[in-house]
Amino acid sequence: MGPENPLVSLSAYTTQLQEHLPPVDTIDATAKAKNGATGTISISFGTTLSGSELTVACQDGVVSVTHGKISIGNKTEEIQDERSGVPPEVRAWGEALAAGKANERQSPEEALADLELIEASLRSGEQGGKPIVLQYQTW
């Protein structure tokens, strides 16, 4: 969303689908940006679905990333799929360390913004979907 249009609130429902993953293994949330745009966030480690999917629909088109492919409009390309964000994050951290320069995308502020989304989702879910005001989404 960016610094000029940060997320400002989030409302979520949470549940535990798998007995061995307490207390919560699934989050379904709706987030609202400063300009009023809304979007959904769905994260589950308890579902039977395999893989991950990311879709962003905007005024000028749609971008989808799923199973090693990225689609922008009608054009689809293969991309490197490492099954999680961990290897690229560690690689970027190592490159920044070797260069002696911090990676802005791995700043404490970025981490705080990510943590805030997860914590707000859990708190909202505990309160039956009550909207939570977000404070740390501007970076």
Annotate the PLM regions.
Residues 49-51, 57-60, 64-67, 88-90:
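C-terminal substrate-binding/catalytic lobe of Rossmann-fold NAD(P)-dependent oxidoreductases
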